[in-house]
């Protein structure tokens, strides 16, 4: 039985962005539930996270991933979380539940799964008003709840480079749904009590600025709470333009994903590092190719090894160093670090440091920056 949040271990809480959502510094990620983890595993992970003081859980309508896995089914992760919430009704008011609407994806099983039976032929995932509202309603059904606390847009409707792509291609696609239409749909969902706040994901500085402009025109800028983008020792792109955009557009909080570079920065894929047959890059070779040991660039692998050696030199684990670095970033003051795992020992180890403030002395930070300067964002290169 999970501890109530009143008796859970201490964890720093903060408002997410400028919203009224009060969230823990760590957020439980769920993307493996339904592929690498089953209902029993998920229940145990939620209970353990709550014992650590976590009140924030992130999922998505397209989860689990990878979508090419034999067991994949759109919405399965939300159903697993919904089953837990249905059996732990008292926990619902203690927890902040975030999910994500899928961005542009042609002929998608994710969009088809919004209806029962699934729509055939499969429609496109888009961020037009009708699609956003249908996605939210489907998520509410699967989650067995009357509201989503944070509804995020998994990626934009317009074309942007995504998930390892690094170069914007002019005029690759120009049939985008206007941001204003999507913003109005989110306002309608908030007015109906179906969502409390909304967020972006895998966005660009241009997108953040346009979203802020659209929300200000609608009077809903205080509802734009967060942005969920990749951030880690091997992907620090957020440090520059996005950090400025989020700061100047009302203080949008960051929810960094893959803070361990898909597990590469944990050190478990080094020789003797403890990777098993169920580890992500062993079970699904070439998934997240920019971080997979078999396909990552030599620069990425070298930088990861440098960070692992630095962790050894300062007497900590590679995972603790990687997570501590992210926690020390100022733009995390109004955000939350997404932490996921496939086994309880791994999750317990990754959540344990959150009981204390993150501390890295100046020498360690200087050493991290020295590695970064030698190999700047290696997983984001051509």
Regions found by a protein language model. Give the residues of each.
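Structural preference for beta-strand elements that scaffold enzyme active sites
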Residues: 15, 23-27, 55-56, 94-100, ...
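N-terminal small/glycine-rich loop or linker at the start of catalytic domains
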Residues: 17-36, 98-123, 152-167
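Short, acidic/polar
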Residues: 37-50, 128-142, 183-184, 208-212
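Non-catalytic positions within long, well-ordered alpha-helices that form the structural scaffold/packing
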Residues: 50, 141-144, 191, 247
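Glycine-rich, aromatic-flanked loop segments that form ligand/cofactor-binding clefts
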Residues: 89-110, 251-263
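Active-site gating/metal-coordination segments in enzymes
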Residues: 108-152, 160, 230, 234
